[in-house]
Amino acid sequence: MSWQNKIDLGLQQRHEAAAYRCRQVNDGANGRWLQTGAQQYLNFSSNDYLGLSQDAAVIAAWQQGAQRYGVGSGGSGHVTGYSLPHAQLEQQLADWLGYPRALLFISGFAANQAVLTALTAADDRILADKLSHASLLEAATHSPAQLRRFAHNQPDSLQKLLNKPCSGQTLVVTEGVFSMDGDSAPLAAIQQHTAAAGGWLLVDDAHGLGVRGAAGRGSCELQGVKPELLVVTFSKAFGLSGAAVLCQEPVAEYLLQYARHLIYSTAMPPAQACALQAALLRIQQGDDLRQRLQQRITQFRCGAAALPLQLGASETAIQPLLVGDNQQTVALAEQLRAAGLWVTAIRPPTVPPGGARLRITLSAAHESEDIDRLLEVLHGVCH
């Protein structure tokens, strides 16, 4: 098969499965509204859970940082790209989350890839929740370790894998909040099984940090768990981008020596680190935002209970409505868009076959009447 035939076949398969992805150009898509051209939509697809991408203090911190440090870092942190705002942010994150060290990465994808590939060897094994994020599963697949997956949120399934012999080390991988279902992992049971087997636990809490736990410390704090490796991202509740890995001192030093995604990537702009410090302060003091978000979640779930679609068992800002059929899911999303509501249709391979859904995400930036409007239109198009 030629290169062109391979490309054509792949595109044809996505079209035939009603799974073809397209990007939409917009003029702003965070917080409450999404603007595209002259059309404005209520935005129920953003991960900006607390609306901090539009926060005046966060924006001002970025502007002031850019005036002081410029708009780029100029290189890898191992060369000239590690500045005072980076060091300050790392220390603030470590103090807040109760770890000796934090290391900044340009994205959560890069952080997960770096940790899994740098820490594991051929005689090690990675035991990952079956529905872990693509960045985790891809990194585990490409790592030298053996990958085995346990049934989603099933500690007993994990235990069966832990019972099997391994000549090297075991790293168990899961998420605090899963991005497509919005459900939470039973972290205490998972950590108990992992520790009893002498393994380490990595938790990716991209969707829990900032919105769950005391002062927004996330899923691990909420469940009383402290994994050996905690990955947090800044593209959700923080309203920006980037990520960090929280760990012990020797692990941080090891990653600085061996994590290629860290060593060979240009560091985030110092101005971004300044903005992240401002976002962190707002999150630490943000019980009002978390309470407001929880009110919107409760309001939506109460109103959506009567819909003919299955509502996912989620207590978080991610509220999936399961449809099943790809074409029907796309059609529903288009009807919502025609009514001024931006809701994303999620289809395989992002979710398992037959798992197509409307992935609704809520934000503290939403007003109560926004939720009422969403429910009104959903009831209209689903009945």
UniProtKB/Swiss-Prot annotation:
Substrate binds at R21, H133, T350. The keyword Transferase applies. Pyridoxal 5'-phosphate binds at G108, F109, S179, H207, T233. Transmembrane segments: none annotated. Its EC number is 2.3.1.47. It catalyses: 6-carboxyhexanoyl-[ACP] + L-alanine + H(+) = (8S)-8-amino-7-oxononanoate + holo-[ACP] + CO2. Pathway: Cofactor biosynthesis; biotin biosynthesis. InterPro entries: Aminotrans_II_pyridoxalP_BS (IPR001917), Aminotransferase_I/II_large (IPR004839), AON_synthase_class-II (IPR050087), AONS_Archaea/Proteobacteria (IPR004723), AONS_Proteobacteria (IPR022834), PyrdxlP-dep_Trfase (IPR015424), PyrdxlP-dep_Trfase_major (IPR015421), PyrdxlP-dep_Trfase_small (IPR015422). GO terms for molecular function: 8-amino-7-oxononanoate synthase activity; pyridoxal phosphate binding. Its cofactor is pyridoxal 5'-phosphate. The modification N6-(pyridoxal phosphate)lysine is found at K236. One of its GO terms (biological process) is biotin biosynthetic process. Keywords: Biotin biosynthesis, Pyridoxal phosphate, Transferase. PROSITE patterns: AA_TRANSFER_CLASS_2. NCBIfam families: bioF. PANTHER family: 8-AMINO-7-OXONONANOATE SYNTHASE (PTHR13693:SF100), CLASS II AMINOTRANSFERASE/8-AMINO-7-OXONONANOATE SYNTHASE (PTHR13693). Catalyzes the decarboxylative condensation of pimeloyl-[acyl-carrier protein] and L-alanine to produce 8-amino-7-oxononanoate (AON), [acyl-carrier protein], and carbon dioxide. HAMAP family: BioF_aminotrans_2 (MF_01693). Homodimer. Belongs to the class-II pyridoxal-phosphate-dependent aminotransferase family. BioF subfamily. This is 8-amino-7-oxononanoate synthase. It comes from Yersinia enterocolitica serotype O:8 / biotype 1B (strain NCTC 13174 / 8081). The lineage of its organism: Bacteria, Pseudomonadati, Pseudomonadota, Gammaproteobacteria, Enterobacterales.
